[in-house]
């Protein structure tokens, strides 16, 4: 059976004043399906996000998408909550990756020239607690602001949310990345966190903004202070977030650079259920809201 065609894309664009942050205009594209995903961001005439490999690709390795109602890996695609055991569909071996929404179609509630709002019901997506997730993406001449919220339904729920951008690697040279964190999470070989922290080492220490070189990172940085700063030969990108975002996953395969701000750790529902403290997992009371915002602000080297 063939899948239905994707919903029409939303196109955002903002004119850039001459001599300020770059030529022409800033353009963004949002695909309601799959995943309510930011699928393109053109700054200074250059595409800054890894593109969709093909029209049928509904995987995680392109664009920028929201992770909810959990982030990263969920061990064995299951967790216990208030005396009950809940299971979900595995999509990475025996584990469940990046929540329930990155491959589903979102409903568009507003589409203007510089702002888009989308939402999706969690119940039909397979979340037994119900609720709704909303996101707003707002574009300006020198920034993109994304706000997301999870609103509980009639039941309290465990939740976390985060963003998973795939930034392109520059063809002009190496990139540097600053993350203000002294610790990462220890993981098993399959990258499931053990719940223990470990100090950064020569490979994972990004506090001074080193060149990435050939580092192949896939690490969760905790208690992150200050912005994340990605510097490429032709663009400086400063990533900030609200105070409830203190975890960043950094993934640097050859195909792109992922800088993922999150309200909680990967596998937070499982770890919190084992008594691990500091996971960032939030209990959302009935009809209450978990909300967070991240902002990407850019400038061009040599321009004021």
Where in the sequence are the language-model features?
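Extended, loop-rich substrate-binding clefts of extracytoplasmic carbohydrate-active enzymes
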Residues: 1-4, 84, 90-141
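Beta-strand-rich N-terminal accessory domains
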Residues: 1-86, 224-245, 288-301
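Active-site pocket scaffolds in enzymes
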Residues: 4, 235-304
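Active-site/ligand-binding surface loops and adjacent short beta/alpha elements
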Residues: 4, 158, 166-242
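Hydrophobic residues positioned within well-ordered beta-strands of beta-sheet architectures
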Residues: 10, 28, 116-118, 133-135, ...
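Short Pro/Gly-enriched beta-strand edge/turn motifs at strand-loop
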Residues: 22, 57-64, 88-92, 116-121, ...
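Acidic, contiguous internal or C-terminal segments within carbohydrate-active enzymes
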Residues: 32, 120-170
């Amino acid at each position: 059976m063939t899948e239905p065609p994707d919903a029409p894309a939303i196109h955002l664009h903002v004119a850039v004043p001459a001599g300020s942050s770059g030529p022409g205009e800033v353009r963004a594209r949002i695909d309601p399906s799959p995943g309510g995903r930011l699928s393109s961001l053109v700054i200074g005439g250059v595409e800054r996000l890894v593109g969709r490999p093909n029209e049928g690709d509904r995987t995680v390795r392109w664009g920028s998408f929201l992770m909810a109602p959990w982030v990263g890996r969920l061990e064995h695609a299951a967790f216990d909550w208030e005396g009950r055991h809940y299971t979900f569909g595995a999509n990475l071996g025996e584990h469940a990756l990046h929540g329930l929404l990155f491959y589903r179609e979102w409903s568009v509630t507003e589409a203007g020239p510089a702002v888009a709002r989308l939402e999706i019901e969690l119940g039909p997506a397979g979340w037994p607690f119900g609720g709704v997730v909303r996101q707003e993406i707002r574009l300006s001449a020198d920034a993109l602001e994304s706000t997301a919220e999870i609103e509980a339904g009639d039941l309290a729920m465990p939740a976390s949310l985060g963003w998973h951008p795939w930034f392109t690697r520059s063809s002009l040279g190496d990139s540097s990345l600053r993350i203000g964190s002294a610790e990462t999470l220890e993981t098993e070989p399959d990258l499931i966190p053990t719940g223990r922290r470990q100090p950064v080492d020569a490979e994972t220490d990004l506090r001074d903004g080193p060149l990435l070189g050939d580092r192949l990172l896939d690490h969760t940085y905790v208690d992150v202070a200050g912005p994340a700063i990605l510097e490429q030969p032709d663009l400086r990108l400063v990533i900030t977030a609200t105070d409830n975002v203190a975890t960043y996953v950094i993934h640097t395969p050859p195909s792109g650079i992922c800088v993922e701000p999150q309200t909680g750790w990967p596998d937070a529902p499982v770890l919190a259920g084992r008594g691990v403290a500091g996971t960032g997992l939030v209990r959302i009371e009935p009809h209450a809201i978990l909300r967070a915002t991240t902002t990407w602000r850019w400038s061009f080297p040599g321009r004021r």
